[in-house]
A protein has these predicted regions:
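N-terminal subdomain of lithium-sensitive/metallo-dependent phosphomonoesterases centered on the IMPase/IPPase/PAP
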Residues: 2-102
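Flexible, active-site-adjacent loop/turn segments at secondary-structure boundaries
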Residues: 42-44, 56, 106-107, 113, ...
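Acidic beta-strand-loop-alpha-helix segment within the catalytic core
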Residues: 120-168
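Glycine-rich active-site/cofactor-binding loop and its immediate structural neighborhood
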Residues: 93-136
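Short, function-defining helix-loop hinge/capping sites that tune catalysis or transport
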Residues: 70, 89, 108-111, 142
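Residues that scaffold the ATP/ADP-binding catalytic core of kinase and kinase-like folds
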Residues: 39, 107, 152
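Glycine-centered loop/turn positions within well-structured domains
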Residues: 34, 80, 115, 138-139, ...
């Protein structure tokens, strides 16, 4: 799990830094979403990345999009680390980006609308930001420690929760 692979020492970040990281993440997932949509429901090259039992598919699109995301992160934040699904971990200064280029590869491969791109940032102990983009619906979900939101096209809504004392 990615949480086990990030730095064990938390890195302090300011509110302004968090806002910048969130803007960057939102822009990047939307950017790669265009590439994903152009390849959705097309012929894909698929490999099995499992190490034994079962089938763990990875497509040429997974690899390409993760490479694009890694390159963008490295250009913008060269000191940050990266953990991704398709390539090895890249150590950094304690701030670590966590990438899943296609969360729902099987759905993507079969033309089903149950996939998206995940991008998050950890300070070494906790998540700082998280984004999930579904390009086929132009839906972006995001969260930081103090708020969360949903954007569809140009319309944005704050996501709220309420206390739940029991689950049953």
């Amino acid at each position: 799990m990615a949480e086990e692979r990030v730095n064990s020492n938390a890195v302090a970040v300011s509110t302004d830094d968090i806002a910048e990281y969130l803007r960057f993440a939102q822009s990047l997932v939307r950017q790669v979403g265009k590439e994903l949509l152009s390849r959705f429901r097309t012929d894909l090259s698929v490999d099995d990345k499992s190490t034994g039992h079962g089938f763990d598919p990875v497509t040429d699109v997974d690899k390409k999009v993760e490479r694009v995301m890694r390159d963008a992160i490295t250009r913008q934040y060269p000191a940050h680390g990266i953990v991704g699904e398709e390539y090895g971990d890249q150590p950094g200064n304690g701030l670590t980006w966590v990438i899943d280029p296609i969360d729902g590869t099987r759905a993507f491969m079969t033309g089903m609308l149950h996939w998206g791109t995940l991008l998050g940032l950890s300070d070494g102990l906790r998540p700082i930001i998280g984004t999930m983009y579904q390009p086929f619906a132009d839906e972006l979900f995001w969260g930081i420690s103090t708020e969360a939101g949903y954007r569809h096209g140009n319309n944005q809504t704050t996501i709220r929760t309420r206390c739940c004392k029991t689950l049953a």
